[in-house]
Amino acid sequence: MIALIQRVSEASVRVDGEITGEINQGLLILLGVEREDDEAKAKRLVERVLTYRIFEDDEGKMNLNVQQVNGSVLVVSQFTLPADTKKGTRPGFSKGANPIDAERLYDHFSDLCDEKLTTQRGRFAADMKVSLVNDGPVTFWLQV
């Protein structure tokens, strides 16, 4: 399971022109679900993402996590993250989970986040328009 996390001052996602999720300070989490992923991996990744210290403390050091700054998260499914890009000029998607399992694990990941802090979501498998102001910019790729 892959999370591309971005520290944001604001982020939103729209489907058919309607906002489905919107946050201020926090993390935009683009989530890619791979074939071998399960609930245990989702739980480990949530714990890692929510405790990852990428927010600045009073001394300007990245020493605080999203919970410590009372931030929120916006979780957006991103089936392209597990793509195989090693050769050729077209990505392969055989490493990604099938849509039924991917949606179930996306929902599970989002529900686990929601137990800890305010969580907004995109819409699984929809054509989404994601807007964000990346604060830094600060972006990390986390994988379990």
Curated annotation (Swiss-Prot):
InterPro entries: Daa-tRNA_deacyls_DTD, DTD-like_sf. GO terms for biological process: D-amino acid catabolic process. Belongs to the DTD family. An aminoacyl-tRNA editing enzyme that deacylates mischarged D-aminoacyl-tRNAs. Also deacylates mischarged glycyl-tRNA(Ala), protecting cells against glycine mischarging by AlaRS. Acts via tRNA-based rather than protein-based catalysis; rejects L-amino acids rather than detecting D-amino acids in the active site. By recycling D-aminoacyl-tRNA to D-amino acids and free tRNA molecules, this enzyme counteracts the toxicity associated with the formation of D-aminoacyl-tRNA entities in vivo and helps enforce protein L-homochirality. A Gly-cisPro motif from one monomer fits into the active site of the other monomer to allow specific chiral rejection of L-amino acids. This is D-aminoacyl-tRNA deacylase. Its EC number is 3.1.1.96. A motif (Gly-cisPro motif, important for rejection of L-amino acids) lies at residues 136-137. It comes from the Bacteria. Coiled coil: none annotated. It comes from Aliivibrio salmonicida (strain LFI1238) (Vibrio salmonicida (strain LFI1238)). Keywords: Cytoplasm, Hydrolase, RNA-binding, tRNA-binding. Pfam families: Tyr_Deacylase. Homodimer. It catalyses: glycyl-tRNA(Ala) + H2O = tRNA(Ala) + glycine + H(+); a D-aminoacyl-tRNA + H2O = a tRNA + a D-alpha-amino acid + H(+). It is found in: Cytoplasm. Disulfide bonds: none annotated.
